[in-house]
């Protein structure tokens, strides 16, 4: 569905969704840095349980879009709602719905896996009564049980990605946003992370960015193609 047909696509499909409600709605969003336009008038919607790929070359606007969704930055104009919460008017509640894994695996390397995930649970204000159980569940879900007592600095790149993903998940967010989750991994690690993302898609809405067509076609059931800050197609 190309951009000149997008308005029709959005209105037509909005009425098909139960209750007319999407988990994420982005309407005519633009982000400018001075005179530089990072994303321009983008619109899309994501339903509960979808695994959505944001596909485009480097500098296309993928990370900017994800940073807006996750609450790291604010859009210049347009509207974003997460689970019905406006990202500007009800930013705290909107951010609570999101688990974000930025590109680059930002970990505290002097902490063990379990210590890091526990620390992330504290930052995300997970109730103390359920924090220990939540941490254990997330560690198991991301396949980190056998390495939970190892320092994160001593892990392979693939396991570091898993730890970062566990940190994003531990807040019990409904939406998981993954920025270039397989970048820098070897073929075996890529296969493992892709399988993990598919498994997480059974219980979460997942949005991931990539510049690799084969990756999003294997993992995602919906693809948003973006280039030079504009959405080119939605499939």
Model-derived features: positions:
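ABC transporter nucleotide-binding domains
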Residues: 24-26, 31-227, 233
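ABC-family P-loop ATPase nucleotide-binding domain
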Residues: 1-30
């Amino acid at each position: 569905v190309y951009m000149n047909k997008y308005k029709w696509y959005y209105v037509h499909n909005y009425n098909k969704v139960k209750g007319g409600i999407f988990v994420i709605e982005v309407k005519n969003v633009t982000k400018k840095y001075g005179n530089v336009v990072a994303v321009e008038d983008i619109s899309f919607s994501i339903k509960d349980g979808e695994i959505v790929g944001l596909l485009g070359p480097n500098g296309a606007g993928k990370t900017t879009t994800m940073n807006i969704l996750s609450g790291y930055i604010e859009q210049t104009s347009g509207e974003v709602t997460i689970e019905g919460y406006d990202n500007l008017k009800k930013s705290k509640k909107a951010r609570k719905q999101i688990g974000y894994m930025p590109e680059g695996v930002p970990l505290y390397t002097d902490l063990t896996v379990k210590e890091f995930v526990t620390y992330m649970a504290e930052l995300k204000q997970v109730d103390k009564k359920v924090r220990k159980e939540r941490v254990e569940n997330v560690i198991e879900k991301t396949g980190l049980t056998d390495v939970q007592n190892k320092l994160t600095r001593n892990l392979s790149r693939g396991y570091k990605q898993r730890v970062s993903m566990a940190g994003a998940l531990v807040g019990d967010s409904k939406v998981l946003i993954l920025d270039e989750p397989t970048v820098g991994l070897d073929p075996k690690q890529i296969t493992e992370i892709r399988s993990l993302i598919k498994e997480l898609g059974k219980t979460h809405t997942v949005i991931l960015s990539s510049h690799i067509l084969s990756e999003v076609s294997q993992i995602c059931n919906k693809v948003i193609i973006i280039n030079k800050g504009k959405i080119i197609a939605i499939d």
